[in-house]
Amino acid sequence: MDRYQATFERLAAQKQGAFVPFVTVCDPNPELSLKIMDTLVKAGADALELGIPFSDPLADGPTIQGANIRALDSGATPDICFDLIGQIRAKYPDLPIGLLMYANLVYSRGIENFYQRCAQAGIDSVLIADVPTNESAEFVAAAEKFGVHPIFIAPPTASDETLKQVSQLGGGYTYLLSRAGVTGAETKANMPVGDMLAKLEQFNAPPALLGFGISEPEQVKQAIDAGAAGAISGSAVVKIIESHLNEPDAMLTALANFVSNMKSATQK
């Protein structure tokens, strides 16, 4: 059984949803980034969603763009990122680990090489933010060849046809957008997502995790009450990193407290 499926089944048995934090690997530097990822898991994260630093993150607001810049300034390369992820994989063999990234980074290594490297690092899924389902064939083929789940975004404005493609092509989980626009904790997630979830279920989609604008435990609870399998929080996590750059111990404590509070909101 794959790690996402095993995790969702374990959580369902415990009457819990999943809480999944997002960080950019190597933010603010490789050494501290490893401690950050470790802290997130120890504090109760059910899976990790990770960004590979990129100089032009289109769908991201200023918070995650800042994380990309810090990581690149610290000397981050995809190889360093894969190495750090491999260390987390070795320590947490059952943890689902996903990448959220952009097509340029995949193309620059060659599509097959990229997914092969993901498989070697123990990565379970890859979501390419700027590749819609109708342009995804070569990515999906390479992902499946190397046992990596392709993840797709179900946006709130999606047609039934798009949701059907997202459901059929995706594996692992479905990234359900709570609203259109760029990422950021300032802009609140807007429910209801019930209609979207009903359609995804009708099309037999992988379990849905709600993302974009999730920054408070109450929103996690709302997402799960609406029928989502869990919630992803990115900008709110990265903001904690950003506001404690000169005090790493306080940063790790604040991250642990945030994850712990968000995770406790997943209990049904």
From Swiss-Prot:
Q: Which organism is it from?
A: Vibrio vulnificus (strain CMCP6)
Name of the protein this chain belongs to:
Tryptophan synthase alpha chain
Q: Where is the active site?
A: 49 (proton acceptor), 60 (proton acceptor)
Record's function text = The alpha subunit is responsible for the aldol cleavage of indoleglycerol phosphate to indole and glyceraldehyde 3-phosphate.
Outline the subunit composition: Tetramer of two alpha and two beta chains.
State the UniProt keywords alphabetically: Amino-acid biosynthesis, Aromatic amino acid biosynthesis, Lyase, Tryptophan biosynthesis
Give the InterPro entries listed for this entry. Answer: Aldolase_TIM, RibuloseP-bd_barrel, Trp_synthase_alpha_AS, Trp_synthase_suA
Give the UniProt entry's GO cellular component terms.
Answer: cytosol
Report the top EC class in one word.
lyase
The metabolic or biological pathway listed in the UniProt record of this protein is: Amino-acid biosynthesis; L-tryptophan biosynthesis; L-tryptophan from chorismate: step 5/5
What does the record give under GO molecular function? tryptophan synthase activity
Which stretches are annotated as coiled coil?
none
In the Enzyme Commission scheme, what number(s) does this protein have? Answer: 4.2.1.20
| Family, similarity comment | Belongs to the TrpA family.
Cited CDD domains = Tryptophan_synthase_alpha
According to its UniProt record, which reaction does this protein catalyse? (1S,2R)-1-C-(indol-3-yl)glycerol 3-phosphate + L-serine = D-glyceraldehyde 3-phosphate + L-tryptophan + H2O
